[in-house]
Regions:
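Glycine/proline-enriched, intrinsically flexible loops and inter-domain linkers
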Residues: 1-242
């Protein structure tokens, strides 16, 4: 943060406030134009899809439906999450930002995944309807320990909804899980409790129309998380990997 503050101050000193803020606006406007142009290439219409999570860990065997509706009108897209499952008793709930974030990830992937930076302009053409009380917008006292599994499924379901309209630009669903294992225990000789996590484990991604999916890759909303080196885990904890 301090480095960013210093560099930004240097830009202001060098070019002046008006020039810097104007450049920022231009960058965001470029991202907006790119997103709108790609959205225009999607046929207007209402697209719907449904996925399921197995259960919430409490009501075993009771599926959690993830239903999305995507409305494309000109250069705008609306993602409606009103019919996603209501929040559940178990820990597969997520806060209100999750529905928005997952919709933004899907929108960015489908409109301008690599050619323009991610900023506010990237999402000006996107509206998200996310009423409270759902697994993507849970309210107190809903448990949220495994919140991160929900947005991956939402992204895949948005792709699924739009697959008939833009089959060349979507992939089939991926493994959509952190693959994370948390271990805890007591070390008698040292008199201490240990709690550790393996970090994200890669899995398989769905294929595109033109090529197979990638393997051993982290899930779509976990690109900023690093796994734990085996050597470090075996040194710090009474764990042996094979």
């Amino acid at each position: 943060v301090r480095t960013g503050e210093r560099r930004f101050s240097e830009l202001l000193d060098r070019y002046g406030q008006d020039e810097v803020l104007g450049a920022i606006d231009d960058i965001m406007d470029q991202s907006e134009r790119a997103a709108r142009e790609r959205t225009l290439s999607i046929p207007d219409g209402t697209y719907e899809a449904e996925s399921f999570m197995d259960d919430d860990g409490v009501d075993i065997g009771k599926h959690i439906p993830i239903r999305v509706k995507v409305i494309v009108a000109g250069d705008r897209m609306t993602v409606d999450l009103s019919n996603v499952s209501k929040q559940v008793r178990g820990f597969y709930n997520s806060g209100p930002t999750t529905g928005y974030g997952a919709s933004q990830v899907a929108f960015k992937c489908l409109t301008s995944p690599t050619d323009y930076p991610i900023n506010d302009g990237s999402f000006r053409a996107l509206e998200v309807i996310n009423p409270p009380g759902r697994v993507v917008s849970a309210v107190r006292p809903a448990p949220m320990r495994s919140w991160m599994t929900i947005p991956m499924t939402v992204v895949d379901t948005i792709f699924k909804a739009l697959a008939p309209a833009i089959p060349d630009r979507v992939i089939a669903g991926h493994f959509a899980d952190l693959g994370n294992a948390t271990m805890f225990g007591f070390v008698p000789d040292e008199g201490r409790m240990i709690i550790t996590s393996t970090g994200p484990i890669g899995g398989g991604w769905g294929a595109k129309k033109t090529e197979d999916g990638v393997s051993a890759t982290v899930c779509i909303n976990d690109g900023d998380t690093h796994n734990s080196p085996v050597e470090l885990m075996e040194t710090k904890y009474p764990i042996v990997y094979e």
